[in-house]
Amino acid sequence: MGLLASAGLLLLLVIGHPRSLGLKCGIRMVNMKSKEPAVGSRFFSRISSWRNSTVTGHPWQVSLKSDEHHFCGGSLIQEDRVVTAAHCLDSLSEKQLKNITVTSGEYSLFQKDKQEQNIPVSKIITHPEYNSREYMSPDIALLYLKHKVKFGNAVQPICLPDSDDKVEPGILCLSSGWGKISKTSEYSNVLQEMELPIMDDRACNTVLKSMNLPPLGRTMLCAGFPDWGMDACQGDSGGPLVCRRGGGIWILAGITSWVAGCAGGSVPVRNNHVKASLGIFSKVSELMDFITQNLFTGLDRGQPLSKVGSRYITKALSSVQEVNGSQRGKGILDMEKQVGCDHDYVSLRSSSGVLFNQRSLMEDDGKQNKRVCGKILPSPLLAETSEAMVPFVSDTEDSGSGFELTVTAVQKSEAGSGCGSLAILVEEGTNHSAKYPDLYPSNTRCHWFICAPEKHIIKLTFEDFAVKFSPNCIYDAVVIYGDSEEKHKLAKLCGMLTITSIFSSSNMTVIYFKSDGKNRLQGFKARFTILPSESLNKFEPKLPPQNNPVSTVKAILHDVCGIPPFSPQWLSRRIAGGEEACPHCWPWQVGLRFLGDYQCGGAIINPVWILTAAHCVQLKNNPLSWTIIAGDHDRNLKESTEQVRRAKHIIVHEDFNTLSYDSDIALIQLSSPLEYNSVVRPVCLPHSAEPLFSSEICAVTGWGSISADGGLASRLQQIQVHVLEREVCEHTYYSAHPGGITEKMICAGFAASGEKDFCQGDSGGPLVCRHENGPFVLYGIVSWGAGCVQPWKPGVFARVMIFLDWIQSKINGPASLQTNNKCKTLKQQLPPPTPSPDSASWPGCCSEAELEKPRGFFPTPRYLLDYRGRLECSWVLRVSASSMAKFTIEYLSLLGSPVCQDSVLIIYEERHSKRKTAGGLHGRRLYSMTFMSPGPLVRVTFHALVRGAFGISYIVLKVLGPKDSKITRLSQSSNREHLVPCEDVLLTKPEGIMQIPRNSHRTTMGCQWRLVAPLNHIIQLNIINFPMKPTTFVCHGHLRVYEGFGPGKKLIASFAGTLAMILTKDILKREKLNFINTYIMHIWENSVYDNVRSVGKRKQKKFASNLSYSMEAEKSRIQVPADLVPAKGSLSGS
């Protein structure tokens, strides 16, 4: 390390130059396309569920293969180095170890991806302390590749953690791999990912203890929920657990090791009430010594090193020139520009203090540190001591000449910053918020007065801007005036912005910056230049609006429940610890005051009724003593948005138990109705079709105490919590509570030591959840919990759904309440859950929903996530006599049930009171399927007992001629078509029918056909009839269609179900290859369905399935028939 010594202070000056961006560790190409934010602002609805990743979503993910079969995951940390779990290699023989290959750039296991690279492994190093018989031994191995990978969009390394990277409990990270879709299935076809939080060691150890497992070791990391469930068991050993730094760079936090609590494991669960499954990962930050010790073996001297931990170019300076402050040395800064300075940077450190533009940033170890990189010219770096260290870190990317610093000793002084006084600037230069780029101070007021010569104007350009957002910038803001009296306001700015230049209209500009006491960001840096007045016309400047909120007020009817005027903003990706809420993002929140003092929170459910906790009002039930304030954010200020009402009547639930807090719910009737507007709106009550499940992410709001010994918060606070299983919550956290956690309670919260959960003053407030783009629904009322005194315990809420009948009976009138019924209330208010241009309506899940538009989209609740639990849905489309209906199944996933028909999607055609089953579908579809029906009525029903998801788009087409003129059912026999029996045969004729005979006795049958078309031809496969029936234990009968022959064949279609209507699945060749391998496997159960009953006797079908095929020139791809055009206007049934 460079050691600088002299008397006085040290001053370092650097000058920056433009730089280009190269491929770097920890960057996903999806970030650049989607502009993934550095700070999480979205609301998470459910995170412990596997989903398909994007193609370039995890470029550091690799597949470890033996004999071309995937067996584990891994992470690329360098061009020729991969880390994985040591246990992945335990069961392999010496011969198998020598034949391991690493595949990078892979997305699909069953087809070759564009950037896929297969590289043999030359050397394996396992951690010396790894022991396969110990749960908590260092489970890590380093693989050396025979040659380097080629980096690209789908192949990039992951960053390894630095010493100052802290992975805190509650931070949401990503796990990825080709884990099995279910316990008995094969690996997933495409790369999966799951978002899950880092778990507190103490909470993790509590769960591990209940399973008779040892506590978490120093080298292990725990992630997930105490009641994670079987989703955790589908992971991929050796794969990465990556977390994101504040600047957006991803780091490798963990390596998937094992899962505690999975069924079939060798370790019994001591307490059979515990349903936990926790992911245990090797903690990379604790294993950096092993990685760095072996990472650079074999590298040539002088070869650039990948960034691992802290490495510095070191040179000691024996003396420093002392100056009086008027002289300034010059330097050079030519380094990569990155948010957070993660890859290349130079920093200034000292043991007692560092000022960087009169700001300091304390590290956890008591030292102070600040990084500099990129091209933005920083002001002098000032250290308060006569000793300092200047570390320089660079990675392998050769993207700049580095830096040159001038070091001088100066006398201590306090330069004016414009904060607490007025700074007058008369020369071109820069100004910035105090402590920039660190967090600006609380309760700051700063003024800069820029004065140019006469006949000149001032150009103000913000090079960086991050100021806490609030509607109308009412808290933190930068205000720019065009006159010294501050009457001509040019702009009022807040949020995280990229702003164009602002030009003054005269030779004066005033910049005013203010901050409050909460949630500070890094502030701003602005450069100002002085230009001749006539140059203003050359630039044609576009002034920003006077107010620039990040989100505008949504154009939603005020009485529509659950829709806030502004989307909630979250400064952190953590789901532990509270923060100030975005003003008016929770418009149903009210404050309850008793004799003028704040007591509890509540939720608006209609203009005259408030829902709150019974314990808040039971002993103070005189309505005259209570006032209710709606539209409030800062309870210490009188805000123009407030509406104050007196209480008229208080109703406490008759079964409220003061000992157990069971039935802790109450209603307050207001003296006069609230006036709904953009900041005062009701919240939806839950609908019976959408129950609340464990691991869902919800939000709690209130003005409760920020700490156990602190006072109430002045501004509304918010916190994200996850829902726990009642049994897990009771037996893990509240086993001694009187009465336990009853069915009338919800347990929610993230167990993290030292974090605020719920405190005095939060009681009665709302627990709201939302499903994807749906409205917020009131599932709980804050009741009790030990979270304020013992932060590692979750909170407990009154379960609102249990009390719906009680609420209705007290309010006395169904018209007075709004439930989350998307079929009626929100059908036209909400966008569809997928960004499909054809989605004109989203009627939701009801006993029967009419599809009223000629085109639209309807899915299961929280599509694309699986709906968990019992669900019955039905949609009806009426088709006029001159139209056809086209249904396209965009997505189908009906898994997780041992009995096939526990989850089924059925399409019926109904004509003259007769119902005909057109299709009954199960399984999983990764492609679209199309149904055509003439109607007059088509009914789609969905039945699920366990889990499932689907999305269907539809359109009604106008038929200009007779309905059957262009679209007819294919005959099961034809004189001109070639009939193909069930055998392994090569088909080259241009068309034919493949038939499977129905056997009269129980048997297992397999049929395989291979179709080869001429060059520049395509193959169309039409399923005429394909019945599949379930046995007691499993669904039998599958049709799979592959592209190509042999080991390289690609699965492009898979069917299971009963398909009997006009179903056309076009299998079209997009490459020059022109062959399809069709493979069918049927397992028949004679006792179940070999024979079809008829009146008086049994009648056997001759054929079980019929499939027709045809080979056509490529230009004749299937088109919508010319006489089918989209229907206009409304639909009518025949």
Curated annotation (Swiss-Prot):
Active site: 87 (charge relay system), 139 (charge relay system), 237 (charge relay system), 615 (charge relay system), 664 (charge relay system), 763 (charge relay system)
Location of this chain's protein in the cell: Secreted
GO molecular-function terms, A-Z: metal ion binding; serine-type endopeptidase activity
GO CC annotation: extracellular region
Ranges for domain Peptidase S1: 38-296, 575-812
Prodomain residues: 23-46
Top enzyme category: hydrolase
InterPro entries for the chain: CUB_dom (IPR000859), Peptidase_S1_PA (IPR009003), Peptidase_S1_PA_chymotrypsin (IPR043504), Peptidase_S1A (IPR001314), Sperma_CUB_dom_sf (IPR035914), Trypsin_dom (IPR001254), TRYPSIN_HIS (IPR018114), TRYPSIN_SER (IPR033116)
UniProt-listed Gene3D superfamilies: Spermadhesin, CUB domain, Trypsin-like serine proteases
Keyword annotations: Calcium, Disulfide bond, Glycoprotein, Hydrolase, Metal-binding, Protease, Repeat, Secreted, Serine protease, Signal, Zymogen
One BP annotation, GO: proteolysis
Predominant cellular place of this UniProt entry's protein: secreted
Pfam families found in the cross-reference section: CUB, Trypsin
Residues that carry a glycan: 52, 99, 324, 431, 507, 1106
Residues bound to Ca(2+): 116
Positions of disulphide bridges: 72-88, 173-243, 204-222, 233-262, 341-373, 419-446, 473-494, 600-616, 698-769, 729-747, 759-788, 846-873
Cross-referenced SUPFAM superfamilies: Spermadhesin, CUB domain (SSF49854), Trypsin-like serine proteases (SSF50494)
EC number(s) on file: 3.4.21.-
Residue intervals of the CUB domain: 284-410, 419-531, 846-957
Extent of the signal sequence: 1-22
Similarity comment text for this entry: Belongs to the peptidase S1 family.
Name of the protein described by the UniProt record: Ovochymase-1
